[in-house]
């Protein structure tokens, strides 16, 4: 006999409230056939590769820190296209539309030859090589050595209209009921911060705050011992609902373990042995050595490698070549909101450090009788050279209610910059206006300063590049512009071999010549 029974499985119902859907910029932004080329000047920077150099007082910065292992974050400021005096006013209707920029092409050019730079520490915390050790070393009070190595090789750039989001591990606050004990390993947590210009990249020791988590100041090299190494949080940026921080990126990393060492110092986490409980873990991890052997006192188990970036070659370069943006990974398909663009770059394949030696005595070098190393001062300098070229496309944003609602939810300050003509309700029908505000009889004028629009990234360090007067419509006059015209098929070849833009839409014919008999 067939009997109906209710299903015992769980029933999943849709949410009672609708989920807000974020539209892609391709759904409401109209692209035009107007393209601009923009490029920066030759951007140069010089400094010390390991640390900042201050004067004797320690207050005035004389030589900044410039390392090949640092992030370079360029903040490119573009002109407002809504203030352009366009020759063809039929491009857009200012009463119903606004203009924005879209990135279509990018080329990050780097100067200087390829080279490997070394880093290290004169008091590096290592006992001995643990890969090919020939005697048992248990360590002493101070086992630090002067050690250097080459960092992990990394080439990377991230392009977006907001700063790149980085991640690093930081010291966390303990629980409220946990007793504070000296020498106990603190809890750590993952932190998300913007990557700023000058932040150190991971060179093989991880992405963490070495200033707070390594108090002996000798576990890593000099360039990161007092710094925080950050790594781009690709997972967070790829899952961003708007996709402004990362339109696209290119990355190439490589390393291998070159040397294997062990740390000096007292072990914080002992290897489980007979001292635990009633001895039920005895001889599970090791058997103690005899008293007449060097192995009677167990050594440290804090093993670590020093990595190497290996071969640097021009065959695997991400720079000095164009990249074309057809489809971004997020909802923002290359639209540069707020007329700005952030380019985050790391490249330590041009990591050569210059060694400069200067004779300290007041004497001509030709008159030096014999060599004395103490009379020569050695200096280190690192130089970097950049140039960035862009292909920008002019786009139109319709001033519709649903479009403005999404832009307002994304970034309400964009609507303020567009000056849409919204008249707010006056808070006070009458205001005070002084005639002689500069006289001694009235109050100080500083109490009534003009309100300036706050910078959303105030307090962050970027390499700001003003490109408001660097745009050109003559794409064929620039290297990246010619590549774009050829790549997009916007050029056609004439009879004599020259090229013209296909936007003219005119037929090109050769001159008819009379045949020779």
Swiss-Prot record:
Protein name: Major capsid protein L1
Any one GO CC term of the record: host cell nucleus
InterPro entries with a match to the protein in the record: Capsid_L1_Papillomavir (IPR002210), Capsid_L1_sf_Papillomavir (IPR036973), dsDNA_vir_gr_I_capsid (IPR011222)
Quaternary structure note: Self-assembles into homopentamers. The capsid has an icosahedral symmetry and consists of 72 capsomers, with each capsomer being a pentamer of L1. Interacts with the minor capsid protein L2; this interaction is necessary for viral genome encapsidation. Interacts with protein E2; this interaction enhances E2-dependent replication and transcription activation.
Example of a GO biological process term: virion attachment to host cell
Tree of life domain: Viruses
Keyword Disulfide bond annotated: yes
A molecular function GO annotation: structural molecule activity
Keyword Disulfide bond: yes
SUPFAM superfamilies: Group I dsDNA viruses
Region (Disordered), start-end ranges: 497-517
Biological role: Forms an icosahedral capsid with a T=7 symmetry and a 50 nm diameter. The capsid is composed of 72 pentamers linked to each other by disulfide bonds and associated with L2 proteins. Binds to heparan sulfate proteoglycans on cell surface of basal layer keratinocytes to provide initial virion attachment. This binding mediates a conformational change in the virus capsid that facilitates efficient infection. The virion enters the host cell via endocytosis. During virus trafficking, L1 protein dissociates from the viral DNA and the genomic DNA is released to the host nucleus.
Keywords: Capsid protein, Disulfide bond, Host nucleus, Host-virus interaction, Late protein, T=7 icosahedral capsid protein, Viral attachment to host cell, Viral penetration into host cytoplasm, Virion, Virus endocytosis by host, Virus entry into host cell
Pfam families given in the database record: Late_protein_L1
Biased composition (Polar residues): 497-509
Organism taxonomic ancestry: Viruses, Monodnaviria, Shotokuvirae, Cossaviricota, Papovaviricetes
Cell compartment(s), UniProt: Virion; Host nucleus
Family of the protein in this entry: Belongs to the papillomaviridae L1 protein family.
Gene3D superfamilies xref list: Major capsid L1 (late) superfamily, Papillomavirus
Sequence intervals crossing the membrane: none
């Amino acid at each position: 006999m067939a009997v109906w029974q209710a299903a015992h499985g769980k029933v999943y119902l849709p949410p009672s409230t609708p989920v807000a859907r974020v539209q892609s910029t391709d759904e409401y932004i109209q692209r035009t056939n107007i393209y601009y080329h923009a490029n920066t000047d030759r951007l140069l920077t010089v400094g010390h590769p390991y640390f900042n150099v201050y004067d004797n007082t320690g207050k005035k910065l004389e030589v900044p820190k410039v390392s090949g292992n640092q992030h370079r974050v360029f903040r490119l400021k573009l002109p407002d296209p809504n203030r352009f005096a366009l020759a063809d006013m039929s491009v857009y209707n200012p009463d119903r539309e606004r203009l924005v920029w879209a990135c279509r092409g990018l080329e990050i050019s780097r100067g200087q030859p390829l080279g490997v730079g070394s880093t290290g520490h004169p008091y590096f915390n290592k006992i001995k090589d643990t890969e090919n050790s020939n005697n048992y070393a248990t360590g002493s009070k101070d086992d630090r050595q002067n050690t250097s190595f080459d960092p992990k090789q990394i080439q990377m750039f991230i392009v977006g209209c907001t700063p790149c989001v980085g991640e690093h591990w930081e010291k966390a606050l303990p629980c409220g009921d946990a007793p504070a004990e000296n020498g106990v390993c603190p809890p750590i947590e993952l932190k998300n911060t913007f990557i700023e210009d000058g932040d150190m990249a991971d060179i093989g020791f991880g992405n963490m705050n070495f200033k707070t988590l390594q108090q002996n100041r000798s576990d890593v090299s000099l360039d990161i011992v007092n710094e925080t190494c950050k790594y781009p949080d690709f997972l967070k940026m790829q899952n961003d609902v708007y996709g402004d921080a990362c339109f696209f990126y290119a990355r190439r990393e490589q390393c291998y373990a070159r040397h294997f060492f062990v740390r000096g110092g007292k072990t914080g986490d002992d290897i489980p042995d007979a001292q635990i409980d009633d001895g039920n873990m005895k001889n599970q991890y090791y058997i103690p050595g005899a008293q007449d052997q060097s192995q009677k006192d167990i050594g440290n188990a804090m093993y670590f490698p020093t990595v190497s970036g290996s071969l640097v070659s021009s065959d695997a370069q991400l720079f000095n070549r164009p990249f074309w943006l057809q489809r971004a990974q997020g909802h923002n398909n290359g639209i540069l909101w707020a007329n700005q663009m952030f380019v985050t770059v790391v490249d330590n394949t041009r990591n050569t450090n210059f060694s400069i030696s200067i004779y300290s005595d007041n004497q001509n070098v030709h008159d030096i009788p014999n060599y004395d190393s103490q009379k020569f001062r050695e200096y280190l300098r690192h130089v970097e050279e950049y140039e960035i070229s862009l292909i920008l496309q002019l786009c139109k944003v319709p001033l519709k209610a649903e479009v403005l609602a999404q832009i307002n939810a994304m970034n309400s300050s964009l609507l303020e910059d567009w000056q849409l003509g919204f008249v707010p309700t006056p808070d006070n029908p009458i205001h005070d206006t002084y005639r002689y505000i500069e006289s001694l009889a009235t109050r100080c004028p500083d109490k009534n300063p003009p309100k300036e629009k706050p910078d959303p990234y105030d307090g962050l360090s970027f390499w700001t590049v003003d490109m408001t007067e660097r745009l050109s419509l003559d794409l064929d006059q620039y290297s990246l512009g010619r590549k774009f015209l050829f790549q997009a098929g916007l050029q056609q070849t004439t009879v004599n071999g020259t090229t013209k833009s296909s936007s003219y839409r005119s037929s090109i014919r050769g001159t008819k010549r009379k045949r020779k008999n």
